[in-house]
């Protein structure tokens, strides 16, 4: 039987789900905050940069992942919503083209207005977006490197915003970035736990299937703790952000003794994590506004 042709609305809907809309703010906000707090002005570069890190960047990051993880996603009962799309078998080429073409005009603009060091940061960010999932590197199958690479996806937009805006680097600013990076490592490690069985059956050698469910959970607890501690040494009101690590620790803690067989139960914690990010983001926004007022 001949498959029905894909309608544009159906393609758009699958690409939308594949881009993980619930996570858009996690990449756009760091860029916006870093750039705006450095330049103290809203300009075309800020607007286009936010749009780029809001949608095309996420479509590239998650869409490429959905293409190369298709077989494991078919075995994964949580796929098909906020956790990612199960693409129609005819969609992988469309997804890759959509990701590349949607990014292209933004990247061209950012290269034109940027400096050589900003080109380097942007190139590194996009390199890790692609080769986290794509062969030959497929970094998501290299334990611990997968968590670090995933973290780069989220803190690199902030680093790029700082570099593009010409920020002056201090050790305290470095601690803020390090704290964000540790949060990213912890979040990936926690998120990987729920897919132990599906990824192992698909032969995906990421941190959780290789090391078992408990190791990434303990890594997540350690990195969330270090992330909060790092903020204690930053400029006021930065130390208050250490409090924001506590809800993440409380979310992960109940699963610390989980077994591989019961790892799917961690999905409940991950669902809380997704919404916790929105609440934490609000707290970070208030602190950034306070910082902007103090330093204006």
Regions found by a protein language model. Give the residues of each.
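Extended hydrophobic alpha-helices typical of membrane-associated regions
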Residues: 8, 215, 233-296
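Intramembrane alpha-helical segments
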Residues: 8, 13-16, 82-168
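Alpha-helical transmembrane segments of integral membrane proteins
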Residues: 13, 22-26, 30, 45-53, ...
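Membrane-embedded alpha-helical segments that form the functional core of polytopic membrane enzymes
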Residues: 28-68, 118-130, 169-190
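Multi-pass membrane catalytic core of lipid/isoprenoid biosynthesis enzymes
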Residues: 52, 70-122, 205-239, 278-282
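C-terminal ends of transmembrane helices
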Residues: 62, 128-140, 192, 255-263
């Amino acid at each position: 039987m001949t498959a029905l042709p894909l309608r544009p609305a159906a393609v758009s809907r699958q690409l939308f789900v594949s881009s993980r809309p619930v996570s858009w703010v996690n990449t756009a906000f760091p860029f916006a905050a870093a750039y705006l707090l450095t330049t103290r002005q809203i300009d075309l570069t800020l607007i286009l940069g936010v749009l780029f890190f809001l949608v095309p960047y996420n479509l590239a990051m998650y869409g490429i992942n959905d293409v190369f993880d298709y077989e494991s996603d078919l075995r994964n009962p949580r796929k098909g919503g906020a956790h990612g799309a199960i693409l129609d078998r005819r969609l992988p080429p469309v997804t890759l083209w959509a990701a590349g073409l949607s990014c292209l005009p933004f990247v061209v603009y950012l290269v034109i207005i940027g400096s050589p060091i900003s080109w380097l940061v942007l190139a590194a960010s996009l390199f890790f977006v692609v080769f986290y999932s794509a062969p030959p590197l497929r970094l998501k199958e290299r334990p611990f490197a997968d968590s670090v690479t995933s973290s780069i996806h989220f803190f690199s937009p902030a680093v790029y915003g700082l570099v593009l805006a010409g920020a002056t680097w201090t050790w305290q600013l470095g601690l803020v970035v390090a704290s964000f990076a540790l949060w990213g490592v912890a979040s990936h490690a926690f998120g990987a736990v729920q897919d132990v069985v599906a990824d192992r059956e698909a032969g995906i050698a990421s941190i959780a299937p290789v090391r078992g469910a408990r190791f990434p959970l303990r890594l997540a607890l350690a990195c969330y703790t270090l992330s909060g501690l790092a903020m204690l040494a930053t400029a006021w009101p930065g130390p208050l952000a250490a409090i924001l690590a506590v809800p993440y620790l409380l979310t992960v803690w109940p699963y610390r003794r989980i077994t591989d067989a019961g790892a799917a139960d961690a999905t409940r914690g991950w669902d809380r994590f997704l919404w916790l990010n929105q609440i934490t983001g609000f707290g970070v926004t208030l602190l950034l506004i306070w910082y902007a007022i103090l330093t204006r």
